Amino acid sequence: MIRITDIPNLEGYGVFVDNIDFKHLSRQEWMDLGKLQMKKLVMIIRSTGLDSRSFHQVIKKWGQDRQNYAATLFARYPWANGQVDQIIASTEVSEEEKKIIREFQRVGGCNQKTGNTLRVSGKKVNGQRIGMFADGELLWHSNESGDIAFTPAVALLGAENMTNSATGFMVTAPYYNSLSDSFRSELDEMILIHNFVPGKINPGLNEPQDNLMYKNMCPDPDTEIPLVIQSPAGIKGLHYSFNTVTGVKGMSKSDSVRFLNDLKWGLAKYTYDYWWENDDDLLIFDNSIVQHRRLGDTTNRLCHRYQFDYTYLQYKVTKQNYIPYSQEPYRSRYVDKMNMIGNMLKHEGKSFPVFV
């Protein structure tokens, strides 16, 4: 029988799932776990028995994969009709862009059969790293954190040499809920400024991967995103990713630093570092109001990362499309970009909600 228990320190926003048998799990049972994950934000499924192929078959039942870099790439080059090889072969595309595309391909991107599942690994084949975030620890971050239309969920399946490393989680909802009504109202109005800062997520990252992270994390300088947003399940928390936030709109640099440091101090207690117990553990987590990090020995470590929308769960949980923001013009900017991304992903046979 499946056993579900709370993860320590996360104040009810995280669960362990044990004794799950994917070979005999019904579709309804799996979808129910998906709805639970949306509401709990962090789910750690121990000892899954999944490999990269079965992982993709299972996780895509919750939602379609999305990589904003790939979608916006095709929007910039519509004549390529979604064919990355045409972009690489074109004389109209800069060599810098081509290097980033090749890096994205090398770590598993641009592969529709696997849902753009990316490898996270320091392993090398013929002297080349086969995955992104190859070496060392990763500092607190969320993916696409400086993108107004960030992808809201991440699934990470272990594969090889995982048990000397940890993945940590920081949930922001309990901190936000602990504040006074007046302070929450102040935070609700605040806008953070995001920029890509080399080395802020993975100190010592090699140049090609740094360029890929720039496109992935914060493609446009001085992007404005509200501090307080809601998760796909409607949970309010902070979209405060340490790796891309460089200031608060309307505040001086010194005041921003003091304010953001106070937030970091308040959030620090709502963290949990999961030291992988099995190579095939599966971690599924919110990417809107939760940050994550990596600790420990990453030598020859290999895992698979699937980034996705809750395409087949969203209406079951909230009865409406997911829009993180209540403030304008950010709500409209999100809708516009999501419609553009949805249009570009039609070439992959994907159908995203039309936002109005």
Annotated model-derived regions:
Residues 281:
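Conserved acidic residues
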